Amino acid sequence: MADASDPEDNMQYFLIFTLLWAASSNARDWRTPDEAQVTLEYIAHAAFRLVGSQGTSLLVDPYQSRWWIGYDFPSGLPASDAVLLSHPHPDHDAGYARGATPPWSADTRIIDGPGDYTVGAFSIRGIRGRHAEPYGEEFGRINTIWRIEVAGLRVVHIGDNEPLNAAVAAEIGDVDVIMLPVDDEEHILSFEEVERYRRRLKPLVVVPMHYRHDDLESDPDRPGDLGSVDGWFARQPDGRQLGTHTISLSRSALKELPGVWVLEHSPLVTRAE
């Protein structure tokens, strides 16, 4: 993967990132004091954990082990208070809709559709979207975009949503951090469609997801229609490889380090053999 990071040692990115938003006539009313923090953890594929400062946690779009992608979902993750599932493909719901044993406990709250939800300090809006073509016809191409507000930040995970339209953009609103599916095979979104999300929503940070991890795949031809993120990332003048799978976010300095952040996958995810 191309290294577009600053020359300083990658360990600097373990520092807490914070977000400062200039006062304006449309200042965001969900802002909270600078001391509030949230931890973002990339697991692999399109799966993330968000952990609030009080310990409440969300698991977003966990994948089913060795379904399409060739590696396992890690068994050593801490329990989450709720799991958000954007759509019923097994690489986004861990096979839950098909009766697979999920990687979360029986008492975990499952949120899998549009609506407004509260989980601890997290305010969540599920926005009705549509799965990118030509996939998902078997379940009506449903896809829920997750807009998550916590610690003065708005974090958006689009699942496998189609190209952005005006109605969805208006409901998403302002964005601080967005997770977008991007890979060199343009499996879900074309590069231009990814840029349309960036231009319209103007997130401070883009975190790419839903791409091939070569170090985890034992079969060079599997999955055949999912590329790495390397080529796209090499084109990003504001790209940074953070050298970590977990970062802490707060609101007072995030815009000092805007752009594309490529996170490592969790070390708990091991190569398929």
Question: Where do the model's predicted regions map?
Answer:
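Charged helix-capping and loop-helix junction motifs
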Residues: G140-R141, S190-R196, D225
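Short, Lys/Arg-enriched N-terminal segments with co-localized hydrophobic residues
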Residues: A2-N10
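Core dinuclear metal-dependent hydrolase active-site scaffold
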Residues: L20, S24-A82, A106-G173, V177, ...
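Active-site environment of divalent metal-dependent phosphoester hydrolases
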Residues: S65-I69, P88-A94, P163-A166, E185-S190, ...
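Proline-aspartate-enriched helix->loop->beta-strand connector
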Residues: S80, D176-V177, V194-Y211
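Bacterial N-terminal signal peptides
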Residues: Y13-W21
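Metallo-beta-lactamase
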Residues: S80-P90
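Binuclear metal-ion centers of metallo-dependent hydrolases, dominated by the metallo-beta-lactamase
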Residues: E41, V205-E273
